[in-house]
Amino acid sequence: WQNFYNDDENSFTYVSMTGLKKEYYGLEAGLKFKVTSWLDFNTLGTISEAKNINNVNAVYMLSKSAEVYTDKAYVMNMRESGTPLTVGSIGLDLHTNGWFVNLNANYYDRIYLSYSPSYRYEKVLTNRQAAYKAYPEIFAPTTLDGMSWTEDAVAQEKGHGGWMVDLSIGKSVRLKKGSLNFNLMITNLLNNQKIVTGGYEQNSRSGYTITTGGEVNNVRVYQFSKNPKKYYTWGTNGMFQIGYRF
């Protein structure tokens, strides 16, 4: 279940979706290859799927009136959010004369945002189609044949993926008693701040108002449905450590 403030209803909304079925599967493979006695090559990749496999009937209540409503929610093929479903990594590990260097390049893709069930209610999809007919220059159609919804109408928002490079360099110095260790770690060496780490769709408020007579008016300049909330990776950052072993 979910709860959020629904601007269209001017009320907190509590949503329950029962009978929702999900599917999880994937493939992962890795390889470690010794190039020389002091250099290793590592690679790892995974591609997975974690999605809903059916549409459901949603039951929701408005806190302002305590009234309960039901509607069909078209949430089939909505993916799990907050984690990349495709990941790849290649790396080099060097160890020689007390030095060690670890360089990794990691790729992340298919990062989905948390979806909004209310944006995919049958009632809302019907209203969005009415908005398209009234303002085709602003809104997109939700159906082309009147029998089914278009793929774009129920598509889940995604985040931008990409590469992130991490570097670790260290040196171990032997002493008469114990050893001294130095380690410098730098994450996101290329300062790629375009990778999305998570977020959610902002669809609790439509870009229009439906009157009691079914007419569309009060079109808003800012369209929440086109501006999902996204979180991004930190830029380049690092840490330097000194340790003494005895």
Where are the regions a protein language model picked out?
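Outer-membrane beta-barrel transmembrane domain signature
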Residues: 137, 149-154, 158-164, 192
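Short structured motifs
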Residues: 28, 87, 151-154, 225-227
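Short sequence motifs at beta-strands and strand-loop junctions characteristic
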Residues: 19-23, 80-85, 156-163, 228-234
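Hydrophobic, lipid-facing positions within transmembrane beta-strands of outer-membrane proteins
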Residues: 25-29, 86-90, 163-169, 236-242
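Structural signature of outer-membrane beta-barrel channels/translocons
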Residues: 32-34, 38, 93-97, 170-174, ...
